[in-house]
Amino acid sequence: EFNSDFIFITNYPRTKRPFYAMDDKEVEGRTKCYDLLFRGLELLSGNQREHRYEQLIEKMKFKGLDPEKFDFYLQAFKYGLPPHGGLAMGLERLTARFLNIPNIKEATLFPRDINRIDKRLSE
């Protein structure tokens, strides 16, 4: 309709997003999440994060997670956090798409794969 290579996809189902994604009060069972696609390729993914301790516990249980195993993560939420969000962008994906590079590893300065794991960093 708008003749654009970009499209936003929003309001993913709660079952398809991580526990920390905030639920959308206006759309039952959906989250305040989005992806930005460029010519069918996901470039950016983001969401408003859940900042309320009790809701995080509830969402962890909904996902089948044990909140006790996330105690360190949850500590800050006990004292209150402001509303916040986050996103991640795939710059290498965008570079590969703009330059018509078929393999993303060729658009990445230090590509990672199963054969390029630096064991010193994991010790």
Where are the regions a protein language model picked out?
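A translation/RNA-centric and nucleic-acid-associated enzymatic feature enriched
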Residues: 1-123
